[in-house]
């Protein structure tokens, strides 16, 4: 009976957790927000995306230009002034991107673990209770669940760290945004270069044409000014800045989407599978946690003693 009771409790928790993960808002009533797990995790991932976008380095700023200029200068004598240096590109990108990707993904992972934990606490409290005969079961089951979640977090963190390393070591994309942004920049330069070179009034045409690609007016004004001065080195630096800008947007979107899918799978759907798959095993391990309330135990023993005395009396009466 105890084993059957435990299996029923665990099966109900597993069933309802999967409902929570798939946008069922009626699991414990519409007023219980912790069990609206898909919505809670979506909030975490939306914040993760917003924070990553806000925290990424603006590679079109003057500081980046200065770093690139200094790095390119050190390579002169072997590379030409208009040459885009791959190692310099990767070094500046990685040093500015790694802390953002690492910190924001760790926050998203911790917050998702918290939301999943809150959902499971609500379900366990509902199905197993937290007093009387199920008091120890409630505590032991939550301990099991916390161990499973902690292990899942460790495994997921390892996978996310591998992703961070890949994004900061490997420079690769087939995303059209990267080539589209660079093509737009080149088009603006081609269309306006002649006017920029001969402009003596510091008012340049075309500097607003790249705003849809994130190429700000201030940046394009600086590009136009460089053409007026006539520096090949400056043009190469600006080209590299645009490449860094476009590639950072690609990585930001790619990383956020990949981490979000990974965390959802490992901390939500994989946990739902584990709860279902391990219900029988956990029921066996938790058998000793289902105990009677002390008052119930005393009453049961008293009734048993009374029953024994009654049976003894009946046997004595049967002798007459």
What does each model-identified segment do?
Residues 1-320:
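Extended, charged coiled-coil "stalk/tether" helices of large eukaryotic trafficking and scaffold proteins
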